[in-house]
Swiss-Prot record:
Descriptive protein name: Cytochrome b
Subunit structure: The cytochrome bc1 complex contains 11 subunits: 3 respiratory subunits (MT-CYB, CYC1 and UQCRFS1), 2 core proteins (UQCRC1 and UQCRC2) and 6 low-molecular weight proteins (UQCRH/QCR6, UQCRB/QCR7, UQCRQ/QCR8, UQCR10/QCR9, UQCR11/QCR10 and a cleavage product of UQCRFS1). This cytochrome bc1 complex then forms a dimer.
Pfam families according to UniProt: Cytochrom_B_C (PF00032), Cytochrome_B (PF00033)
Annotated gene: MT-CYB
Residues bound to heme b b566: H97, H196
One function term, GO molecular function aspect: metal ion binding
Membrane topology: Multi-pass membrane protein
Binding residue positions for a ubiquinone: H201
Length: 379
């Protein structure tokens, strides 16, 4: 009798995706982040579901309901902090996953890559809406500042912002719809993840060398299942260490003050994972210009397949490109730091230089360096 694993219509799909999947024999730990992102998404959906059972999306009671979850609900504090810090772990894994894709040239699978970029946008939008829900000072003012950016769109901007707000300011209608969107979006993300995997399995995984590995494949199970379990254990350990020892490390103290439309916090800033984009937004004195730079700072990822001029796929054997890649990483760290600083000298000029450098490295330096390497290697 043939194994049900290979014949059953549903189990067959799982088998071809996670068990009998041919995988390159040399993929490193950098290939673990896909499964870790899946775990993060599962944790976020589960903890979010339990939070939604006790949360109320009304301006009068939202802040109190979060306090109630932390004080009165059984293990509510644990669920709440796992959800808040789970978002941070999600973004750490996302940035490492994207960085891996850039370093090893995984963007040449452009359907997989483009869906990945759309996923990044979706996760960022979902995280932003989630940050508004506790209805603290930073929730309210963050929502006001970021939604207000849409007013920079010519002609329809103001109407669009008021339409999103559901009134003339961020209020009850805004909070209610943000809760609705924050709830639905992770399920849309899950569907997109399946499409992401579908396209990935059309081509098979890339590997550190960037060479075709069809001649040397191994089954995903047990080799990479056991490897993924190690990653999962490390991720859970890191998350729980954060949650149980310093749950507020990455949060903003201002968000423990209930939202007050009459008092603006001295420094409005988003969560750490948006600071690099926030720094780029702030570094341009023009409102529309800033918004465009903000959008293009992420959208630029879609250009990587077009900007790839090297004859080799991976950066593994391209030391000059490696230098420029790590310079880009250092630049992103600089932008993240600047995004959390007040708008004053010398932070303004550092932010502007780092923002220019970000686009120059991607659009100009990396392609030119690739061409130089082609010449040096006589390709």
């Amino acid at each position: 009798m043939t194994n049900i694993r290979k014949t059953h219509p549903l189990i067959k799909i799982i088998n071809h995706s996670f068990i009998d999947l041919p995988a390159p024999s040399n993929i490193s730990t950098w290939w673990n982040f896909g499964s870790l992102l899946g775990l993060c998404l599962a944790i976020q959906i589960l903890t979010g579901l339990f939070l939604a059972m006790h949360y109320t999306s009304d301006t009068m009671t939202a802040f109190s309901s979060v306090t109630h979850i932390c004080r009165d609900v059984n293990y509510g504090w644990l669920i709440r902090y796992m959800h808040a810090n789970g978002a941070s772990m999600f973004f750490i894994c996302l940035f490492l996953h994207v960085g891996r894709g850039l370093y090893y040239g995984s963007y040449s699978y452009f359907e997989t890559w483009n869906i990945g970029v759309i996923l990044l946008f979706m996760v960022m939008a979902t995280a932003f809406m989630g940050y508004v829900l506790p209805w603290g000072q930073m929730s309210f003012w963050g929502a006001t500042v970021i939604t207000n950016l849409l007013s920079a769109i010519p002609y329809i901007g103001t109407t669009l912002v008021e339409w999103i707000w559901g009134g003339f300011s961020v209020d009850k209608a805004t909070l209610t719809r943000f809760f609705a969107f924050h709830f639905i979006x992770p399920f849309i993300i899950t569907a997109l993840v399946m499409v992401h995997l579908l396209f990935l399995h059309e081509t098979g995984s890339n590997n550190p060398s960037g060479l075709i590995s069809d001649s040397d494949k191994i089954p995903f199970h047990p080799y990479y299942t056991i490897k993924d379990i190690l990653g999962v254990l490390l991720l859970i350990m890191a998350l729980m260490t954060l949650v149980l020892f310093s749950p507020d490390l990455l949060g903003d103290p201002d968000n423990y003050t209930p939202a007050n439309p009459l008092s603006t916090p001295p420094h409005i800033k988003p969560e750490w994972y948006f600071l690099f984009a926030y720094a780029i937004l702030r570094s341009i004195p023009n409102k529309l210009g800033g918004v465009l730079a903000l959008v293009f700072s992420i959208l630029i990822l879609m250009l990587f397949p077009l900007l790839h001029l090297a004859k080799q796929r991976s950066m593994m054997f391209r030391p000059l490109s490696q230098c420029m890649f790590w310079m880009l990483v250092a630049d992103l760290f600089t932008l993240t730091w600047i995004g959390g600083q007040p708008v004053e000298y010398p932070f303004i000029i550092i932010g502007q230089l780092a923002s220019i450098l970000y686009f120059v490295i991607i659009l100009l330096i990396l392609p030119i360096v690739s061409l130089i390497e082609n010449k040096l290697l006589k390709w």
